Amino acid sequence: LKCLTPSLWVAQSRLYFSNSGVFLSEGRACLVDPGVFPEEIEALARFLEERGAPPEVIVLTHSHWDHLLGPERFPGVKIIAQANYLAAISGRAADEIPWQIEEWAAEHGIDRPQPFSLPEPDETFGEMLELAVGELALRLVHAPGHAVDQAVVYEPESATLWAADMLSDLEIPFVSHSLSAYEETLAMLSAWEVRVLIPGHGQPTASKREIRSRLEEDRAYLAELRARVLQAVREGLTVGEAVRLCADMPYRHPQENIGPHRLNVESAYLELGGEADATKVGWNRL
């Protein structure tokens, strides 16, 4: 694990460069999205055992499958999630998330001793929750856009932002919930003092310039996405034509992100009033 602040350690998975966090203070620990592979979760458990600090709380930043594998290793530990989490794991997702995990486990030759059960939160919150961890005062803040139940974790003393699945150096914004909500979330975060940034996927940074750059680039991407897709809708273009209209938009790592960009365009097309089969286009079709 890498120590980023006197109270925060981060471990990075080999899957999607996923980050897991440990906030530690006065012998008390809070885990954030512990994962992903069994041996990586075990390493987190050993880290805490060596420090005599069993976890008291697990924060799940949102309900996507790659963020949900840790709690089963820590039975009895309090789980906190945003209030929309319960709806997000119900319905179709109640079957899809375990299926995604089974597919991932089979692909990587992981022998799971028991079927996956969706983590059930012991506490949920609406827009904000203050969480004490030793002497730390963490703020859990609703930050939708990527997911309806997404939340960030902010530690004001060190101005540390755990940004969930946003502000990556590798990924563009994955607008799998709502373009409007994502824009509002980034506007909110832009007003905060942030000296240490940890994305859900990718490299953490303590560079003021890098933090500002990621915020500005992602906000600019969303603004251009909105403008171009709105133009397509107003001109009566099809969703395929909207995708072509947005094909030359600039964004980071285009070779890796061309698929997510297309899904963003399709989902924005539906959100902004375009007519298409929502089961066949956008993030909902995955």
Language-model segment annotations:
Residues 1-46, 50, 152-165:
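Conserved beta-strand hairpin/beta-sheet module of binuclear metal-dependent hydrolase folds
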Residues 32-35, 56-64, 80-83, 142-144, ...:
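Active-site neighborhood of phospho(di)ester-bond hydrolases with catalytic His/Asp-centered motifs
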Residues 37-39, 63-69, 86-89, 147-150, ...:
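Active-site environment of divalent metal-dependent phosphoester hydrolases
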Residues 41-42, 46-126, 130:
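Active-site HxH/HxHxD metal-binding segment of metal-dependent hydrolases
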Residues 74, 181-241, 245:
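Divalent-metal (often Zn2+) His-rich catalytic cores of metallo-beta-lactamase-fold enzymes
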Residues 126-155:
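Core dinuclear metal-dependent hydrolase active-site scaffold
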Residues 151-166, 181, 185-194:
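Metal-dependent phosphodiesterase/nuclease catalytic metal-binding core
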Residues 231-286:
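C-terminal regulatory/interaction regions
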